[in-house]
Amino acid sequence: MKTFVIGDIHGCYTALLAVVDAAGITPEDCLITLGDYIDRGPEVRQVVEWLLDWQQTGQLIPLLGNHELMMQASRKDTQSYQFWLACGGEDTLRAYTPENEEMCLDYFPEEHWKFIENDCHQWHETATHIFVHASLHPGLPLERQYEQVLFWDRCLLHPPHHSGKIMICGHTPQAEGIPANYGHAICLDTGVYLEGGWLTCLDVASGKYWQANQSGDTRSCQLGDPRPS
C-alpha cells in the first residue's frame, strides 16, 4: 500500500480524475487530501461526490481547508456569507443550484454538509510526516494548534515543527505550478484553478509527483528536480 497526497482541488474534477489515473492510485492505497475542495473551479459538486465515493474504500483521509471553513461560517451570518462569496463561494453555489433558480446554500445536500463537518480532519500525523492545510505553529502539539495557523497562515511563516516531522501542506499557490520542497515543509498547492495551474499528487515515500490540469494534460517529476515533463 502506498500513501498519496493531493493538494488543493478547488472544484477541478477533470484534473482530479486525470491525476489519480496518472499516479495509478488504487482503492488499496492511502489517499490524503489537503482540503479546499470547493470554490473557484467549475466542478465542485463532482469533486465532493467523488470524495464521498472514494471514502467507501476506507482509505481516504480528507482534511479541512479554509474554504470549507468559510462556507460553514457563511450559514451563521450575512457578513460571513458575503466574505465567502467574495473568495470563490459563487462558484460553489453555481455548481449546486438548478438552472434558472436563485443561487443559495439550500441546494447543498445534507450528505455533503456531513462530509465537510463530520468527516474532514484538521490534520493527520504519521511516524514521519504531518499533513495539514496551511501551516503549523512550531512549538505547539497538534491538539493545541491555532485555527489561524492551521488554515490561514502561509507555509514558510514558521520554522520547522518541534516534532522534527516534515509538514506537507497546501493553501499557498506555488509559482509556475511547481510544488515547493523546503526540507521541513512541502507545499502541494499548485493553483489548478488558475491559468497555467496544475493539480499535484505526491507519492510520499518516493517523492515522485504527478500533475494534471483542467485540459486533462498530465506530467510528472521528482521533488527537487527542476521541472516536470
Predicted regions and their residues:
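N-terminal active-site segment of His-dependent metallophosphoesterases
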Residues: 1-50
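Residue-level marker for buried hydrophobic side chains located in beta-strands
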Residues: 5, 31-33, 62-63, 130, ...
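Conserved beta-sheet core of the metallophosphoesterase superfamily
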Residues: 140, 146-213
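Beta-strand-turn-beta hairpins that frame and shape the catalytic cleft
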Residues: 1-4, 124-130
